[in-house]
Amino acid sequence: MRGMGDDGMGPMAMAPPRSGHATAAAPPPPQHKMAMMMHMTFFWSDRAVVLIRGWPGERGAGMYALCLLFVLALAALTEGLSVLSRRLARRGGGAASSDGGRPAPAPASSAALLTAVHAARMGMAYLVMLAVMSFNVGVLLAAVAGHALGFLLARSRVRPAARDGGGGVACEHGGLPPADGSKT
């Protein structure tokens, strides 16, 4: 006959004594699992792992340079797709309707193209973000340089200032509002 509180599970093991020192060392990790160190602070090395396990890794400075060029190009293309997205949005959805009222809705093909460009831009932006999360300073600098280069080529519209007679460079900020808030 079972007594009160007897659930049939047997006696419970006692908790280890509370003392200032450990009574047993932790067992070593299993040998079949590969230990992988992840940096949580920025570091400078050509032995980084960016986006894909083992890449560029221990493959040397040449592969690291290729990785940096890839991140730079990815960031620049992200800026280029941003401009393309704005142009498609202006072209597809800004036409006035025949009655002079609200703008006519964009055709479905225009909306689908705009959605595809947006999805590609966001995918590239997330890849750049994940690359920067490697905490490698070179990758961070490549991402910033890529965004700057993409902005310069796609959005700033830098061209020679021949028409104003000056020897400088005229710069129009296409798609960006003026800094003073005016509508010019």
Swiss-Prot record:
Keyword field: Copper, Copper transport, Ion transport, Membrane, Transmembrane, Transmembrane helix, Transport
Subcellular location(s) of the protein: Membrane
Coarse class of the protein's main subcellular location: membrane
Any one Gene Ontology molecular-function term assigned to this protein's record: copper ion transmembrane transporter activity
Record membrane topology: Multi-pass membrane protein
Any one Gene Ontology cellular component term annotated for this protein: plasma membrane
Pfam families, sorted: Ctr (PF04145)
InterPro entries tied to this protein: Cop_transporter (IPR007274)
Regions that span the bilayer: 64-84, 124-144
Compositional bias of kind Low complexity: 1-25
Start and end residues of each stretch annotated as Disordered: 1-27
Family (UniProt): Belongs to the copper transporter (Ctr) (TC 1.A.56) family. SLC31A subfamily.
Name of the protein described by the UniProt record: Copper transporter 6
Functional note: Involved in the transport of copper.
